[in-house]
């Protein structure tokens, strides 16, 4: 998977929707400021620029998490700008790799994914907007929700949740883990695997 390599680097201040971003990071499992910082790709000190009252020693309730997301939403554009600047190099590396592998609009390709929401593929499409104008097609075995935009089209074998879906994902997980970034070796961009 390329969630770590595409989601944060794809953030554009003018298009960023914080509430949607958090929705795809399991907000019901957020219990600390540290987790909020991790989701946003920030350190605790960086998070304090937007939430000066952060305390690392308390557990957050679900209503408090929603309140914090609301406070961050009021600063959405500034936060997105900060994240975008922080991840600019990773964005350039991802775009270089994707351009190397896919090229321009003459290339025909599709992505295949086991289980997902389509959100990471939306992020991929956002990364590719400067060099690829056609919608990106992704085929999912199971699509939990349907996130499409003008830049991506998702197809699903099972269009909703199926029993034992998480077991299927465990059995099919890549042994090398997620793609966490990209690096250039001998003038060739390659994935850095986690």
What is the meaning of each model-derived region?
Residues 9, 15, 31, 35-36, ...:
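Long, contiguous domain-sized segments
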Residues 1-40:
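Long, charge-dense
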